[in-house]
């Protein structure tokens, strides 16, 4: 399992708008980012795992689409999220 339920709940509590909020874009992007970071570390020791690399590219695309949606809907929340996650430089 990539992410323990405790870690997932801590991310949901940190980025959610209210208790039990799993659908807001901030939570979804934060969960995707955690999975992407895990897979990035995985590829440092498993360089030829091409099947998982395909999954990583899919996750990155999902995160990009969610960030694009959030930027279109609410720029302030988008900027706060990318700063908190450290996604853009």
UniProtKB/Swiss-Prot annotation:
The gene is rpsO. This is Small ribosomal subunit protein uS15. The keyword Ribosomal protein applies. One of its GO terms (molecular function) is structural constituent of ribosome. Part of the 30S ribosomal subunit. Forms a bridge to the 50S subunit in the 70S ribosome, contacting the 23S rRNA. It comes from Oleidesulfovibrio alaskensis (strain ATCC BAA-1058 / DSM 17464 / G20) (Desulfovibrio alaskensis). One of its GO terms (biological process) is translation. InterPro entries: Ribosomal_uS15, Ribosomal_uS15_bac-type, uS15_NS1_RNA-bd_sf. Keywords: Ribonucleoprotein, Ribosomal protein, RNA-binding, rRNA-binding. One of its GO terms (cellular component) is cytosolic small ribosomal subunit. CDD domains: Ribosomal_S15p_S13e.
């Amino acid at each position: 399992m990539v992410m323990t339920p405790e870690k997932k709940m801590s991310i949901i509590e940190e980025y959610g708008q209210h208790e039990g909020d799993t659908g807001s874009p901030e939570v979804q992007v934060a969960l995707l980012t955690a999975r992407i970071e895990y897979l990035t570390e995985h590829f440092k020791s498993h360089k030829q795992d091409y099947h998982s690399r395909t999954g990583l590219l899919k996750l990155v695309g999902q995160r990009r689409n969610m960030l694009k949606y959030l930027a279109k809907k609410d720029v302030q929340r988008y900027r706060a999220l990318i700063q908190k996650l450290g996604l853009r430089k």
